[in-house]
């Protein structure tokens, strides 16, 4: 990773806050995002699901977090499942997190490899009445792509049809809107990296440059400051493309006398900055 991880006390607090709002005799499960293929042997860069990152600090694919607050055994109150490195993985992708590393990042003591998940879930599911599931409930969510979380929820409800279901999303929406001081520090850092990017670009812009050249200046500054890169697809729209809400082609030449609209932000430890003050 390019960033210094947050202290795991942040994630311990986040998990504790979430579990305090869960109904009695229930458990919650959170899944990482998929890695999406683009051809026979190449993939898009991995982006962790923000909710499981908020609760664990684990930035790795094939990760599952299980929370079971009623447990009388601390070993089953918080359980993390991670991908196991094999020889093929070590050669082609590099080492995945060890259990020790996952513990240091998350503050979770009980860690299994992901192939043990269904057996562990089965041993706990018979003891609870309610499953908390984590569906995307954003009012603009309309993607036809079935996520890893979607597949898990379909499997879970078919496997355990007699259990009640509760929603994790309303709890997380409330809790994620209140940031820990360490999280605020990362937002400030994202702001500072973004500021450096804009300062660099303002010195670079001149008539007849191309929008993608401006994009290149931003990404140079972001990565040079240990950011993962753009927090979202950058919008660099000159001329009449100012009027397009989500113009991301960035392939036009910027003519003299035109305005350039830029909607760009850097990411720092999965945090970003999207707002500007009206007076600065």
Predicted regions and their residues:
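Hydrophobic alpha-helical scaffolding
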Residues: 4, 8, 142, 177, ...
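Single conserved hydrophobic/aromatic residue that forms the stacking wall/gate
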Residues: 273-280
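Acidic/histidine-enriched ion/cofactor-binding microenvironments in catalytic or ligand-binding pockets
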Residues: 56-59, 155, 242-271
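Short, basic/aromatic beta-hairpin or loop at an interaction surface
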Residues: 229-240
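Active-site pocket-lining segments that scaffold enzyme catalytic pockets across diverse folds
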Residues: 182-222, 226, 232
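Short, well-ordered alpha-helical packing segments
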Residues: 19, 26, 35, 188, ...
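A composition/biophysics-driven feature that prefers long, compositionally simple stretches
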Residues: 1-196
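Anionic group-transfer/hydrolysis microenvironments
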Residues: 33, 136, 239, 263-265, ...
């Amino acid at each position: 990773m390019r960033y210094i991880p947050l202290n795991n006390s942040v994630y311990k607090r986040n998990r504790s806050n979430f579990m305090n709002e869960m109904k009695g005799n229930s458990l919650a499960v959170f899944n990482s995002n998929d890695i999406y293929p683009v051809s026979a042997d190449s993939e898009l860069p991995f982006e962790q699901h923000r909710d499981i990152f908020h609760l664990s600090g684990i930035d790795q694919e094939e990760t599952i977090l299980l929370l079971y607050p009623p447990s009388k055994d601390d070993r089953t109150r918080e359980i993390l499942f991670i991908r196991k490195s094999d020889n093929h993985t070590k050669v082609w992708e590099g080492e995945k997190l060890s259990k020790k590393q996952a513990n240091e990042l998350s503050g979770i003591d009980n860690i299994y490899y992901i192939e043990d998940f269904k057996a562990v879930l089965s041993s706990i599911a018979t003891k609870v009445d309610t499953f908390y599931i984590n569906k995307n409930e954003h009012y603009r969510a309309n993607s036809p792509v079935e996520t890893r979380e979607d597949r898990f929820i379909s499997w879970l409800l078919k496997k355990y049809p007699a259990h009640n279901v509760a929603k994790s999303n309303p709890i997380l929406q409330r809790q994620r809107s209140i940031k820990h001081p360490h999280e605020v520090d990362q937002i400030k850092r994202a702001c500072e990296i973004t500021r450096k990017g804009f300062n660099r670009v303002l010195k670079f812009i001149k008539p007849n440059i191309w929008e993608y050249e401006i994009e290149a200046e931003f990404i140079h500054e972001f990565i040079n400051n240990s950011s993962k890169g753009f927090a979202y697809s950058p919008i660099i729209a000159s001329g009449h493309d100012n009027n397009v809400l989500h113009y991301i082609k960035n392939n036009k030449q910027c003519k003299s006398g035109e305005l350039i609209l830029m909607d760009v932000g850097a990411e720092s430890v999965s945090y970003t900055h999207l707002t500007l003050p009206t007076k600065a």
